[in-house]
Amino acid sequence: MRITSRWTSMSSSSSPAQAFPRLGAPIHALHGLALAGLCLTLTAGCRSTPEPAAESVEIELPETFSALTGEDVEIGAEPWWTTFEDESLDRAVGEVLGGNFELRQAWSRLRQSEASARAAGAPRIPSLDGTASARYQEIDQSGSGGFNIPIRTGETYSLGLSLGYEVDLFGRIDSTLKAARLEEAATAADVRATGLALSGRAVDAWLTIVERSALSDLVGDQILAGEQLLELTEARFATAGTGSALDVLQQRRQLEGTRAELPLLAGEVERARYQLAVLTGEAPGDQAVDAPRELPALPPLPVLDVPSALLTRRPDVVAAGLRVESADASVAAAIAARYPRLDLSAAYNFDANELADIFDRTISSIAANVVGPIIDGGARRAEVDRQRAVLEGAIDGFNQSILAALQEVEDALSLERRGLERIAVLELQETLAAEELIQAR
């Protein structure tokens, strides 16, 4: 399947929700990433804003994933780790999501982007300012012409309101607001991505504790079996003469090698506990981890969507796509900033020489100003070039996020398939080891 996304630097009025409404969006969300060009015109005598050339992005997506077909179990909206049905795991992940500093930082960045979006939309509403002033002045004219003229004094009081509004002729304000809102949506997707990543690290650490603890128990059983086998080997060598000293030494060496695994496993358990403590927002120490010594049953592999649909469930891919649209809107704002700006203003003031007469005289005014750049040293053109470079980088980042997502899924499926093959071999090895022990007795 080939998906072609065309990005232009002047965005249409499509909302962020139309592109990536939420995790689990339909497949048309990726196909809908194409942005239409927008030509803005003024009255006669003003030229239109040029539409930059579109960039084509082609990504070849497979029709299906290459490995494994899941059982008839859909991916639900509930937290994914609850499928293990283990209360201690649920508590561990909940503590991580409640105290992790990375996740707190992600929420802080979201609040920052929300505030930036509100600030970007402020120019769409007229601004109203109030002014109040009092002035006292003295004029000394005694040195003028040699005459002794008394000093003149005067007082002036004023009170007023001023209204200002910028007419968004070329869509600069709207484009800036759109870019900010899209960045806000992308930051919200970052929060979800951070939460998912942290939950994965927490589950991995918890499973490491359980698996290494269970393996320690298994090694303990192997040590007991090895000690029994060593006793049998020594007895055969000492009484029946059917063995050799070499057999005894080899069995002793194998037994000590098995015992040497216990400190390694204990160290891995400690490091996993430290990792879980740091993820929870605590200093690593002697924190107890409520974890069983037996691995929970694996839930069935869920049905996998086609790759193009599965990508819409990935918050990192969603965030990358939203940032492409945000960068596109920023290019539009930079282009619009190169054209004239129309400012409207109105003022209503009270003015008097005596404070008691402040409301006796009023001054009102209405003005319209057209401000446009003539010579700016190429600053605005450079800003357009910079925003276009940001857009190109965002597109490349979006492509990379898609490829990384596909690789992660394929890697996980490969590990699942090879893991099942290894389990079959280990089960056969277990059977042979049991027969070997019986024969040794």
Which residues does each PLM region occupy?
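Small/polar-residue-enriched beta-strand and adjacent coil segments characteristic
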Residues: P79, E85-E87, A92, G99, ...
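Glycine-focused motif/segment detector
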Residues: A240-G241
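Amphipathic alpha-helical coiled-coil segments
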Residues: Q105-A120, T194, L198-D221, Q228-L230, T258-A266, ...
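Terminal intrinsically disordered/low-complexity segments used for targeting and assembly
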Residues: M10-P16, F20, A25, L30-G98, ...
